[in-house]
Amino acid sequence: VYSQYSKISYEPLKTAAYTHTAMVDASITLLAISRNIRIERAKICALFHDYAQFVDNCPHDQHAKLSSLYCSQFLRQTELFKINEIDDICYAISRHSFKNKYDSPLCEALKDADVMARFLENPECELSDIEKQRLFKATADIQK
């Protein structure tokens, strides 16, 4: 993922790709530990969740689905994961933009980590009511 980000020629987009992905990775790691979610799967979700948005500059409403397809292709090529593991990871990535819907524990962790990352990158960013709820719940879970 990061090797592909290094090829982004527009410097602000490259910086955003590195920064946001790293922040989601750190956030989901804490959430996975606190929520007893498999860390490896969580971190893969973090790495790929916005991949298509940064690498292909695709429209926001399509980035989650396209990112999940990239992830599926990558994981299948490694031959290190079972089909159900790949499906679980890719489902979470494909659904992470639907912050107002409740999904699998892995998907919920990714949604919450995405919101946490946005807040940590810019504490003055505008958050919707559901994003605020997610941020408060995520920080409470980490404090447990």
Regions found by a protein language model. Name each.
Residues 74-81:
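Post-HExxH zinc-binding segment in Zn-dependent metallohydrolases
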Residues 39-58, 63, 67, 88-97:
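His-Asp-centered metal-binding catalytic motifs of divalent-metal-dependent phosphohydrolases/nucleases
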Residues 83-87:
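All-alpha amphipathic helical-bundle segments outside canonical DNA-binding/catalytic cores
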Residues 1-7:
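Short alpha-helical hairpin
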Residues 9-37, 48, 77, 95-144:
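Divalent metal-dependent phosphate-bond-processing catalytic cores, especially two-metal-ion Mg2+/Mn2+ enzymes
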Residues 19-23, 63-69:
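Short acidic alpha-helix initiation/capping motifs at coil-to-helix transition points
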Residues 15, 19, 55-58, 62, ...:
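A short glycine-/small-residue-rich loop at the edge of a beta-strand within enzyme catalytic domains
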